Amino acid sequence: MSPMPRVAVLGASSSPVVGIEYERHPEWSALAALPAYDIVLLDLPAVRAGEALRSLRMDKRYRFSLIYCCQEQDASCKALSDGAPPADLSALVPLWRLWQERFALFNRGVAPERFESRVLAWLWLHPHGAIHAVRDAGVAQHYHYPLLEALEDDESPNAFAWLQLMTQQGWLEEGELVDRVRLCVGCGSGRLNYVDVCPECQTLEIARQPSLHCFTCGHVGAQEHFLKDGLLLCPNCFSRLRHIGSDYDRPLENYRCRSCQAFFVDAEVEARCLDCGQAHAPDKLRVREVRHFRLAEAGRLRC
């Protein structure tokens, strides 16, 4: 075991890093041609730190390394880093030695080859770490797990199905519930558009239409059907409607379908998938809970 860790600081900040010896580099790409460092400190804004973290975690040399974010962190930083460094940077030395001891215990110090072993190893080596769900508008299901993506190599497991399987086997346990999303039954996408349609013919061609309710006979119809020679007359019982509240009233919203001419009070709601085009009733959509996950006791024993 090396007596002292080699530390790299990424970022062009001129602010000094006190308490530990280090080498500063402006970009993470500068590390590619150099021997691997033991600890990396990212002195970068959150967005750039997140990009650097994704690249570092996909590099097998830095997959399990201690990497800290010195500036403000976003969700990707929290998912892939060891958080903020200790205020006294000299405390990094015992943390690194503990990391070395744990790595030597896992699989006798040999880097794990299988995807599930890599994930368990990462969680084992980062005791306060978790598999964080991160919201991403570019993902069809609205959330993804950056840590799993960084560790997958040539494997491409379905993250949600894999997490459910690992939880059922007892290696992982559910953490905080982050969100609940609704997905298309056909393709599993969460890119859904909720539209009001005619309950008779399911067309979008509907419009609000003023209507009247005759108190004499109870007839409800479009206001235009009650107008005759400038007077309000019920088209059903021919009563003259003079006073709103005593002769007639205006119901809440009514709609007219421009395709089939149906007249109705409540439109039907459809969830239309923007990816595959299928339409479903909202209560038929798949509901998925989005959670963070952490290493379970059985997972620790497996390590």
Question: What is the role of each PLM region?
Answer:
Residues 1-58, 87-91:
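A short, well-structured beta->alpha microelement
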Residues 5-6, 49, 72-92, 96-98, ...:
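Regulatory and interdomain segments flanking nucleotide-handling catalytic cores
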Residues 36-39, 64, 80-84:
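Short, well-ordered alpha-helix to beta-strand connector turns
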Residues 57-62, 189:
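Short, charge-rich binding segments
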Residues 19, 63-64:
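A generic structural signal for alpha->beta connector loops
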Residues 73-182, 186-196:
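N-terminal alpha-helical interaction blocks
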Residues 168-295:
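Cys/His-rich short segments
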Residues 41-42, 64-75:
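A short, hydrophobic beta-strand element within the central beta-sheet of small alpha/beta folds
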